[in-house]
Structures are given as C-alpha cells and as structure tokens.
Swiss-Prot record:
Main location: cytoplasm
Xref: Pfam families: EFG_C, EFG_III, EFG_IV, GTP_EFTU, GTP_EFTU_D2
GO molecular function: GTP binding; GTPase activity; guanosine tetraphosphate binding; translation elongation factor activity
Protein name per Swiss-Prot or TrEMBL: Elongation factor G
Length: 699
C-alpha cells in the first residue's frame, strides 16, 4: 500500500466561494488565504493584485473569470482543531461565465455564498443559487461589507429567505453597522468577538454581550437552537427537557441540517476590514461536508450498468477533469477532482469518453498562483496534472482495469457569434492555434469556419465572453485580430407535419445511382431536439442504408430551410421507399434523404426562431420610465417589477438581437447608475416582419 495520507478524509473540505460581482468574493478569498498562512501580503482587488485572480484581464476588470483551485490549511481561530485541508475552487460571479460556475459546482462538496450587506441578494446570486440547488451543494452564507454605508444584516437574511427560498439561520449578529461596525456576536458561545486591528485580525478578544443587544441575541439564539434541535428526536428531547443545548450539540444539529440542505447558517463581517473571515473558516470546518459526508458519485461501468465510486483510497482510481488552463510556464494544466483511489505521477490512466490512454507526468497542487509539485493525490483531493493531451472539461480519467464514466457535464449552446480575422498574415497561423487552445479550455466557446465566406466564426455565451476570448488571444498568444459585428445564432423549425418523397436516380452508362425514400417530418416541443425514427417494414429500404438517410437529413438540417440557419426540434421518420439491387448505394440514399427533407420542410410552415434573453435591470426610481420605455422599444416583454435597496428591479424577456450595445445605452439613460444581468432563456418564434428582414439579409 502507498504511504498513509497526510490528512484524513474527514478533515478535508472542498468548497467554492460563490457571489455576485461586487459582493467582495475575491477579497474574502484573499483573507482566507492570508489567515491560513498562504499569502503573506494581502492582495486587494481594487489595486489589482489579488492572489486568486491570476489572469491579467481579471485584474483590470476587477471580476473573477477563471476558477483556480487553491489548497490551504486551517487549525481554527483558537487552534482548536487538528489540521484540516481546505481546497477552494474560485467561482466567477459574472453571468457570461455561468458555465465556469457549473463546472466548479460539479466538483465541490460545499459552498460559501458571499452577499453584500448593502446590495443583498442580487439577480446574479439567484442564478448561481439555482445552479447550486441542482447539484445539492450545502451552503453557508457570509454577509460581507458590514462596514459600508447602508449595511443591513437582517434585511439580507430576509432576502435569502424570500428571494432564494432558503432557510437562513444566523449563527452570529453584527455589533454595529456601517462605520460603527465593531465585531460580531457568536450566538453559540454567547460572546462578543472583537478582532485586533493592529495585527490585521489574526488575534481577537472575547467580551460580554453589550447590554443593549441582549434581548435581540436571546431571540436569534432561540431560533438557532430550535433549528439545531430539529435535526433529531434525541436533540429535540434534550432541548424540551433543559430549554437549551450545549455548544457541541448545537454545532452537531446545525451540521446535520446543513448537510441535508435544510438550513443555511449565516455569518457576517467585513473581509476588507479583516473582520469575520476567521470565524467563517471555523464554520467551514464545523458545518460543511467532507468528501465522506456526500453520497458516492455515480457513473456508468464499462458494460453499461450503473456503478459508483465512494471516497476511499482503497477503491479503484476515478477522477473528473473540471477545468483546463493554459499555463505560460508548464503548458496545459488539467484540474481534476479525485473521487476514489490513488494516483501517482508516472501512472497511466484511461479516458473512457475519448477511448484513450494517457500517462500522468507531473502532479501539482496549486496555491493560488504558486504551485507545489506532489508525488501522489488521493480520494477527495483536487490537483492539476501537466501535459494531458486528450482530456477536455467534463471527461473522466480512471484506472484502466476498472473503467467507469462519471456523469457527463452538460454545457449550454452558444447564443452569439462574431466573425474574426487576423490583422496580418503572420497572425493567421497563430490565431488557429490560439482559438483551438481556448476552445479546449472552455466548452461553451466554439470556433468554426463559415464555408461560404471562409471567415472564422467564434461563438459564445455573451458579448463579454467573446471580448475576453479576443483579449486573451492578444495577451497570451500575441495574436491581433479584427472582430466583426456580433451576430445572433438564429434557428429554424417547422409548425406542421408533412410527408415527402425524395428520389435520386442517375443513369449514365455503367453503374447508376438509385435511392428512394418517404419521410414524415413533424414538429417537436421547443427544446426537444432532433429525433430520427426508422419505421420501414419488410425491408423495402435495406437496413444498411438507413444511417445514410439520417446523415443526409442531418446535413440538410444544418443548411436551414429559408434563411440558412440550423433546423431544431423536429422528428423525422422514414416509413417507405424502394431500392435497386445494383444501383443503390449509401451515397444515393444520403442524397435522397437530404432532398426529401429540403423539399418537405419548406412545405411544413417553416419559422425562424430567435434567442430570447432573461434580463434583469436594477435602476434608481427616477430613471424607471426611460429604462422601461427603452426595453419596450427593444421588443422586451416586462415580466414583473420589484423593489430592492438598490432601486427598482425590472424583470424582462428581450430578444438577443435587440440587446447589442445595451450596456452603453443603459449607462447613458441612467447616468451610469443602473445595472443589468442577462442570461439565455429560450428560443422563440421571431415576428414575421423581423423574420422576413433576416431572410432577405441572408439571401
């Protein structure tokens, strides 16, 4: 057996820190690294030197884009725990990067949601929260920026309840707020905590609860104890008997309910002012799961049956790659989470999705932007491997004798595209290489060449997403490029069913060509995708030609019906046809299939679909009229309005085509005070006047 593990599994935490853009996530992560002794100099986002944000653009934009994985160690505020390992996966908070968030949530066991005490629960927080619900990730809440004007802890707690439908349980209360924010009350210990400003909060003092807060503390402490008692009959009986629970029992009850996703313990502080992050680290250990607290990961065994791998060094090795990054020093880094078994550098692993074997070269554990070379990595841990060639995001790597494919990640389809061309001949070749690497890192980004115009087209999740790609080409690969106007990814579909024959015959001396099919083409529900059914009876079309027919249909679908955009959400059934003993071939049936689809679809009430975005605008009341008027002009459908401390919230569905340049227009409408977020919602039929204009433009 291998050497024993340095830190037992139950003392490992894999967590993410998720937040809205300005909630202070990067500063919070920074402080975590500082107190756990990783970074000696605290990085500040607004000076652009944060340790986690290691890509240059993030420093310029002050937003976090790439999820870097960082390992640190914590012994507790009072050194009260044995050594724990905390792996932090940094998740971006910007809506164009939800894919990065999905990816990191997939490999986390628990998360800390950071909220701004002033802005509260913002639209973006809701998106990320829903994603975390989907993966059943237990969470803690940290209400940050308690020192800011307008800070209000309990208002944020209520928003977590109302807007996120969660069950927040404060385990701390703030002492003062805004510039009078002094420290926090620990409701479990019933003590006030004041961090020492002289040593940047590394030490603290405990004091009695201020007189004027005792009643409030009593009220919230009771709520917390009731929440803990509800975790088991045993604790409930103790609570009913004694009217109180010991600190150990409270923590035990809260832990159980947090792991079951029944409650969200809420803490508060100001990361920037070095208050509260230390206690947050204790809470990560007290309430968030270790790899042994979460269910075994499921997957598909080599024979197609369902299998699973539990977090143990003794099980066969299995891991999931969740992030590919190009590193200027070592080349391609593949970040992966080990679910079971042990991997040593030099081992060979198998990638079942690509059907390829790879050898693991160096293994690295990342500390934000420094790296430590390690000899082995074990169940429950997160590390990066250097130089894997075939592995892409979402792939499994496993032991070749015990093959398993862990659940695949689903990535959204891009909704926006731009044409891009190199500025000089010298950039031409480099551009291809750069785009290939970036597409390998980011599955929500696609590259293809437009056959007609021979232009290179890049597609992504939003304007910002593509801007950053172009930016990275310039910085990391020294490729200068000219970027065209953004274009919308329209789709086409049909509204009624038709039956259509496609017959291809060529008789020109020697062997001819013969293919004859009848297809039934029917519309499907929006989002249902494409389905092909073979309903041939009695072999009128031999089975070996059926895949060729489907191929012909699929190729024709890519070419569109009226406007040249891909066709979606249709079912095609081949139900009749004929063949010729000598002249029939796959080629002939492929052409027949494509002819039948082309002809049939054009008679089936074809319509153009456009991407509709879910947009949320937050605006001060005085600009409300202008903002709504502008959204109506953009064919927006207002879904609802709401109040928030930051102003009015307008929920609206708007076609993507009308949203280009919206950031600039909104700034000038509201003198820079309104903000918005936008994410893809659905495809919907474009109004006929719009559709006609687009078709005309295409022809």
């Amino acid at each position: 057996m291998a050497t024993a593990r340095e830190i037992p599994l139950n003392r490992t935490r894999n967590i993410g820190i998720m937040a809205h853009i300005d909630a202070g996530k990067t500063t919070t992560t920074e402080r975590v690294l500082y107190y756990t002794g990783v970074s000696h100099k605290m990085g500040e986002v607004h000076e652009g030197s944060a340790v986690m944000d290691w890509m240059e653009q993030e420093q310029e934009r002050g937003i976090t884009i790439t999820s870097a994985a960082t390992t640190c160690y914590w012994l507790g505020m009072d050194q009260q725990y044995p050594k724990h390992r905390i792996n932090i996966i940094d998740t971006p908070g910007h809506v164009d990067f939800t894919i990065e968030v999905e990816r990191s949530l997939r490999v986390l066991d628990g998360a800390v949601a950071v909220f701004c005490s002033v802005g509260g629960v913002e639209p973006q927080s809701e998106t990320v929260w829903r994603q975390a619900n989907r993966y059943h990730v237990p969470r803690l809440g940290f209400v940050n920026k308690m020192d800011r004007a307008g800070a209000n802890f309990l208002r944020v707690v209520n928003q977590v309840k109302d807007r996120l439908n969660a069950n927040p349980i404060p385990i701390q209360l703030p002492i003062g707020a805004e510039e009078d924010f002094k420290g926090v009350i620990d409701l479990i210990r019933e003590k006030a905590i004041y961090w020492n400003e002289a040593d940047r909060g590394r030490t603290y003092e405990l004091a009695d609860i201020p007189e004027d807060m005792k009643a409030e503390v009593q009220k919230w402490r009771e709520k917390m104890i009731e929440a803990a008692a509800e975790s088991s009959e045993e604790l409930m009986d103790k609570y009913l008997e004694a009217g109180d629970l010991s600190p150990e029992q409270i923590r035990q009850g809260l832990r159980q309910r947090t792991l079951a996703n029944e409650i969200v313990p809420i803490l508060c502080g100001s990361a920037f002012k070095n208050k509260g992050v230390q206690a947050l680290l204790d809470a990560v250990i007290d309430y968030l799961p270790s790899p042994t607290d979460v269910p075994a990961i499921r997957g598909e065994e080599d024979d197609g049956s369902e299998g699973s791998r539990s977090a143990s060094d003794d099980e066969p090795f299995a891991a999931l790659a969740f992030k590919i990054a190009s590193d200027p020093f070592v080349g391609t880094l593949t970040f992966f989470r080990v679910y079971s078994g042990i991997l040593k550098s030099g081992d060979s692993v198998y990638n079942p999705i690509k059907g390829k074997k790879e050898r693991i070269g160096r293994l690295l554990q990342m500390h934000s932007n420094s790296r430590e070379e390690i000899k082995e990595v074990r169940a429950g841990d997160i590390a990066a491997a250097v130089g894997l060639k075939t592995v892409t995001t979402g792939d499994t790597i496993c032991n070749q004798q015990n093959i398993i494919t862990l659940e695949k990640m689903d990535f959204p389809e891009p909704v926006i595209s731009v044409a891009i061309e190199p500025k000089t001949k010298a950039d031409q070749e480099k551009m291809g290489v750069a785009l290939g690497k970036l597409a390998q890192e980011d599955p929500s980004f696609r590259v293809h060449t437009d056959e007609e115009s021979a232009q290179t087209i890049i597609e992504g999740m939003g304007e910002l997403h593509l801007e950053i790609i172009v930016d990275r080409m310039r910085r990391e690969f020294n490729v200068e490029a000219n970027v065209g106007k953004p274009r919308v990814a329209y789709r086409e579909t049909i509204r009624r069913s038709v039956e259509q024959q496609g017959k291809y015959i060529r008789q020109t001396g020697g062997r001819g060509q013969y293919g004859d099919v009848w297809l039934r083409i029917e519309p499907r529900e929006p989002g249902a995708g494409f389905e092909f059914e073979n309903a041939i009876v009695g072999g009128v079309v031999p089975r070996e030609y059926i895949p060729a027919v489907e191929k012909g249909v699929r190729e024709q679908m890519e070419n569109g019906i009226r406007a040249g955009y891909p066709v979606v959400d249709v079912k095609v059934t081949i139900f009749e046809g004929s063949y010729h003993d000598v002249d029939s071939s796959e080629m002939a049936f492929k052409i027949a299939g494509s002819m039948a689809f082309k002809e049939g679809a054009s008679k089936a009430d074809p319509v153009l679909l456009e991407p509709i975005m879910k947009v949320e605008v937050v605006t001060p009341e005085e600009y409300m009229g202008d903002v709504v008027g502008d959204l109506n002009r953009r064919r927006g459908m207002i879904q609802g309005m709401d109040e928030s401390p930051a102003g009015k919230i307008v929920d609206v569905e708007v076609p993507l085509a009308e949203m280009f340049g919206y950031a600039t227009d909104l700034r000038s409408l509201s003198q820079g005070r309104a903000t918005y977020t936008m994410e893809f919602l659905k495809y919907a039929e474009a109004p006929s006047n719009i559709a006609e204009a687009i078709i005309k433009q295409q022809s």
